[in-house]
Amino acid sequence: METIHFTKVHGSQNDFFLVDEEENHITEWSDEKRANFAIKLCDRKHSLGGADGILYVTKSSEVGPIGQMRVVNSDGSIASMCGNGLRTVARYLLEKHALTDAKVETMKAILDVKKATSLGFDIPTYQVEISPVKFAAETLPMHVGVEKLFNQVIPELDAELAFSAVSVPNPHLITFVDQAVLDSNKQEKLASYLNSENPYFPDGVNVSFVKRLSDDAIYVRTFERGVGFTNACGTAMSACSLIKKMLDNDILETPLNVYNDGGRVQVTAKKDAAGEISLQLIGNATFVSKGSVRYENDVVTELTNEATDEQGQYQALVKEVKEFLKTTE
């Protein structure tokens, strides 16, 4: 029998159980055990309400970063990156080490994280780097007959919609649409197909439909690989922001407001001397509750769960966002 302590967290209501492997003495768990635990704990029918995945936090394998994040989705699959999750891990580690900025190791990169000015309502807000950014088909991987897909119609996917694809480093397929397309079932049909056996995206892909709201604001809805529709996907919001800036020739460094079903974030971008692009995702890092479970014979049983008062603060932002989005329909 093992007792596992957790913090229930969310970024833009993309919710997770954050599990510190060192404090729980589970650093020797196999990937299979981490996956099985995630499947059990993240079940939406569980007494704790489930989650989109588990954020496993442990020591970095490199010198410099204050910790490492590993993301396991609710179906047991591994996510190479999660922007919403990284914000909450950034807060957890920065508070643990009494810092305001640092570096955190992820599966594909070591990324800058820091505490940021609140988006409002005294919501804890953090800024995290999203990189590397790649457009080459092999980085997704993608097989649609082009080496780089940018604002192009792919008849095999849809006769009218123009798509762009980018990895950040997880793969994203993005199209800008109007409200009528958002209200249709096009996204669900396409995303479900591309995340089952198909010749175009053999490893699956996150599929985002984006609506322009103004010159400095967009709405993003994402079907996440391994999860399905979620309130928000941090890397998707970052990737969609970059594509919008490229399509409209926007200044990369200018903040873009990104609205989603889970709230609002801001995204900026920059290009270094070598021409490499990186993104900065700024949004909430909400701690919903702290608790513990018993894990025995592949069964997860709730032991304790104590709520914080932070969700009330975030709901004030959500209310504001919903009222704003009604005016854009």
From Swiss-Prot:
<dbReference type="Pfam" id="PF01678">
    <property type="entry name" value="DAP_epimerase"/>
</dbReference>
<keyword id="KW-0963">Cytoplasm</keyword>
<dbReference type="GO" id="GO:0008837">
    <property type="term" value="F:diaminopimelate epimerase activity"/>
</dbReference>
<keyword id="KW-0413">Isomerase</keyword>
<keyword id="KW-0028">Amino-acid biosynthesis</keyword>
<dbReference type="InterPro" id="IPR001653">
    <property type="entry name" value="DAP_epimerase_DapF"/>
</dbReference>
<feature type="binding site">
    <location>
        <position position="206"/>
    </location>
    <ligand>
        <name>substrate</name>
    </ligand>
</feature>
<comment type="similarity">
    <text>Belongs to the diaminopimelate epimerase family.</text>
</comment>
<feature type="binding site">
    <location>
        <position position="73"/>
    </location>
    <ligand>
        <name>substrate</name>
    </ligand>
</feature>
<feature type="binding site">
    <location>
        <position position="170"/>
    </location>
    <ligand>
        <name>substrate</name>
    </ligand>
</feature>
<feature type="binding site">
    <location>
        <begin position="83"/>
        <end position="84"/>
    </location>
    <ligand>
        <name>substrate</name>
    </ligand>
</feature>
<feature type="site" description="Could be important to modulate the pK values of the two catalytic cysteine residues">
    <location>
        <position position="172"/>
    </location>
</feature>
<feature type="binding site">
    <location>
        <begin position="234"/>
        <end position="235"/>
    </location>
    <ligand>
        <name>substrate</name>
    </ligand>
</feature>
<feature type="binding site">
    <location>
        <begin position="224"/>
        <end position="225"/>
    </location>
    <ligand>
        <name>substrate</name>
    </ligand>
</feature>
<keyword id="KW-0457">Lysine biosynthesis</keyword>
<comment type="pathway">
    <text>Amino-acid biosynthesis; L-lysine biosynthesis via DAP pathway; DL-2,6-diaminopimelate from LL-2,6-diaminopimelate: step 1/1.</text>
</comment>
<comment type="function">
    <text>Catalyzes the stereoinversion of LL-2,6-diaminopimelate (L,L-DAP) to meso-diaminopimelate (meso-DAP), a precursor of L-lysine and an essential component of the bacterial peptidoglycan.</text>
</comment>
<feature type="binding site">
    <location>
        <position position="14"/>
    </location>
    <ligand>
        <name>substrate</name>
    </ligand>
</feature>
<dbReference type="GO" id="GO:0009089">
    <property type="term" value="P:lysine biosynthetic process via diaminopimelate"/>
</dbReference>
<feature type="active site" description="Proton acceptor">
    <location>
        <position position="233"/>
    </location>
</feature>
<dbReference type="GO" id="GO:0005829">
    <property type="term" value="C:cytosol"/>
</dbReference>
<dbReference type="InterPro" id="IPR018510">
    <property type="entry name" value="DAP_epimerase_AS"/>
</dbReference>
<feature type="active site" description="Proton donor">
    <location>
        <position position="82"/>
    </location>
</feature>
<feature type="site" description="Could be important to modulate the pK values of the two catalytic cysteine residues">
    <location>
        <position position="224"/>
    </location>
</feature>
<comment type="subunit">
    <text>Homodimer.</text>
</comment>
<protein>
    <recommendedName>
        <fullName>Diaminopimelate epimerase</fullName>
        <ecNumber>5.1.1.7</ecNumber>
    </recommendedName>
</protein>
